[in-house]
Amino acid sequence: MDILKLSDFIGNTLIVSLTEDRILVGSLVAVDAQMNLLLDHVEERMGSSSRMMGLVSVPRRSVKTIMIDKPVLQELTANKVELMANIV
């Protein structure tokens, strides 16, 4: 999977687990040079409760894991491989 960079996931929904046992689900808008994330349309899940948060900046140091649906990952990988094969 080292063919993809985090910036390749912009526009896709990510599931981000944070150090405070919180989970954020939102669409990746941007990644800065320090690998901080900007997510939009974010739903925060904590235990059995959840809330909508809108646009959220996520510091890299608070991220434990980042997940994406497998079919989306496979499609992104296939698109990137095809794009790289067509570069002259």
From Swiss-Prot:
One Pfam family in the UniProt entry: LSM
Stretches assigned to the Sm domain: 1-72
GO CC annotation, single: cytosol
A molecular function GO annotation: mRNA binding
InterPro entries the record matches: LSM_dom_sf, LSMD1_Sm, Sm, Sm_dom_euk/arc
Subunit structure: Component of the N-terminal acetyltransferase C (NatC) complex, composed of the catalytic subunit Naa30/MAK3, a large auxiliary subunit Naa35/MAK10 and a small auxiliary subunit Naa38/MAK31.
Role according to the record: Component of the NatC N-terminal acetyltransferase, which associates with the ribosome to acetylate nascent protein chains in a cotranslational manner. NatC acetylates protein N-termini starting with methionine, followed by a hydrophobic or amphipathic amino acid, with amino acids at positions 3 and 4 also contributing to NatC recognition. The first 4 amino acids of cognate substrates are recognized at the Naa30/MAK3-Naa35/MAK10 interface.
Note: Present with 2140 molecules/cell in log phase SD medium.
Protein name: N-alpha-acetyltransferase 38, NatC auxiliary subunit
Species assigned in the record: Saccharomyces cerevisiae (strain ATCC 204508 / S288c) (Baker's yeast)
